[in-house]
Amino acid sequence: MGWTRRRSDPVRVQTLLFDGVEEQDFIAPVEVLGLAGKMGAGFTSKLVTTGPPGTVTCMHGTRVEVPNGWSPQDADILIVPGGGYTDRTGPGVHRLIADKGFLATLAAVKALPVGICTGVMVLSAAGITRGRPATTHAGAKAELQAQGAKLVNARVVDDRTLITGGGITSGLEVALWLVERFVGAKQAQRVETVLEYERRGSVWRSS
């Protein structure tokens, strides 16, 4: 990660939306980090799109107005959700994977990349997961490993400058882990209590 954060600085999060994105993949971290910010944890959260600002149609038909194009140079954390992985011709992650210009820009991003579910496959296509511990949705694990990642069977995998989450609902655990990692376990527990949610699975951390 190419930045040094003072404790007084807000953690600037951008969540990338695109046509075909899985609703749960991005809603969970937006909810968790937005709540953390309101509780004084120092997170700011922004929805962004790789194209011009406008309406994104999600996997299950939800339409979201995204007011911002992505500006990764202004982010400390870039969250890439998944969606549409099983349909290689429709909207979803495969359109991002096919966009070589986007992948080149993504590969050069200095913000901490965070992949949720099959959004990890977008990071993989950009070469970010190659040779590194990572996880993804169960249906994509074999391909992730074939593309050079070191597959870890954990809910959240934190390799310091790369974080990945496995499964559609893993965005909850990933986001709560981000709160814990950046502002402490006590603050993460406060958010968890307000959400009335109990984290599941394990967090694997590189030594």
Residue ranges and their predicted role:
Residues 79, 135, 157:
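Conserved beta-strand segments that form the floor/walls of ligand-binding pockets within enzyme
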Residues 154-164, 168:
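Amphipathic alpha-helical segments enriched in hydrophobic/aromatic residues interleaved with Lys/Arg
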Residues 113-114, 135, 152, 163:
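Structural detector of well-ordered beta-strand residues that form the stable sheet scaffold
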Residues 17, 136, 166:
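Small/polar loops that bind or transfer phosphate-bearing groups
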Residues 130-138, 151-154:
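Short hydrophobic/aromatic-enriched beta-strand-loop microsegments
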Residues 1-113, 121-125, 141-145, 150-153, ...:
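Extended, subdomain-level signal for the structured scaffold at the beginning of enzyme domains
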